[in-house]
């Protein structure tokens, strides 16, 4: 539903963002546009050089926690192209393509590697920003380069994967290039000599699986564990799994011997954030209409027409409680957008 904002000079009809992000919070923006070609992207950037705007994919990793005072621009470029050499398939996908549909497309055309990343919501353009990952695989291993438009110069650039500063749910697009680049496409390399990755969780029980077997199991597990955002508003995992030193883990194990962990290297481990949150009794708790999901503590949901303020309140309560109990700082994975842009907990 639109909202009317009135000032001394004019009446402005604000655009509702509720259906444009999967959390479904009641927020609005000053204007909304859908960018469907590189040409229209250049035009939009030229017209908004001195105006605030926020770039959006499918809104699956974004929560609008207040009315945004600017234009929201949906990056909706489409197209998939495939080339190959002796060792790899070279896949060029436009930023507005659905990530899951790209996974399905590649599987259908016997180009394997993406199957562990099935059913991750969002667009191709969002994948490198977040360095999406699941079940032992992160998308960075397949990215050759990312094509983007510099929002200051309006010029197209291509940045190699090695320069993207990929990390755990992290990249240069969240830091040095945050709000400075519009991703328009991504080039992937899928090896022809495919090797399954089945070291994580339920996949470890698969015996000599095909790529289709892995895809099927990932879809099955994700559908069982995670609420469907089209039914129950959410943005998937709200917090990142924290990474701590082995020395810190040893100290924590003195007090919490059952704390699970996953070794990353000889010096660091990853702790499941869901376990930390569950230990503190947040699973199933409400803050107004926002709820910590009763089956998966890492997912916050819009259970009963919640608001952005309620989401921030519950997220901060969880973050502060984890810090107090475990001396671990939880970072939120979801992009929180307020009136003037990014909001931090």
UniProtKB/Swiss-Prot annotation:
GO aspect biological process, one term: peptidoglycan biosynthetic process
Domain of life the protein comes from: Bacteria
Obligatory cofactor(s): FAD
Assigned keywords, A-Z: Cell cycle, Cell division, Cell shape, Cell wall biogenesis/degradation, Cytoplasm, FAD, Flavoprotein, NADP, Oxidoreductase, Peptidoglycan synthesis
Active site: 169, 237 (proton donor), 333
Listed pathway(s): Cell wall biogenesis; peptidoglycan biosynthesis
A Pfam family assignment: MurB_C
Cellular localization per UniProt: Cytoplasm
Residue ranges occupied by any FAD-binding PCMH-type domain in the UniProt entry: 25-193
Enzyme class: oxidoreductase
InterPro entries per the UniProt record, alphabetical: FAD-bd_PCMH, FAD-bd_PCMH-like_sf, FAD-bd_PCMH_sub1, FAD-bd_PCMH_sub2, MurB, MurB_C, MurB_C_sf, Oxid_FAD_bind_N
Listed EC numbers: 1.3.1.98
Keyword Glycosyltransferase in annotation: no
GO cellular component: cytosol
Family annotation (PROSITE patterns): FAD_PCMH (PS51387)
GO molecular function terms listed in the Swiss-Prot or TrEMBL record: FAD binding; UDP-N-acetylmuramate dehydrogenase activity
HAMAP family noted in UniProt: MurB
Record family assignment: Belongs to the MurB family.
Protein purpose: Cell wall formation.
Protein known as: UDP-N-acetylenolpyruvoylglucosamine reductase
Lineage of origin: Bacteria, Pseudomonadati, Pseudomonadota, Gammaproteobacteria, Alteromonadales
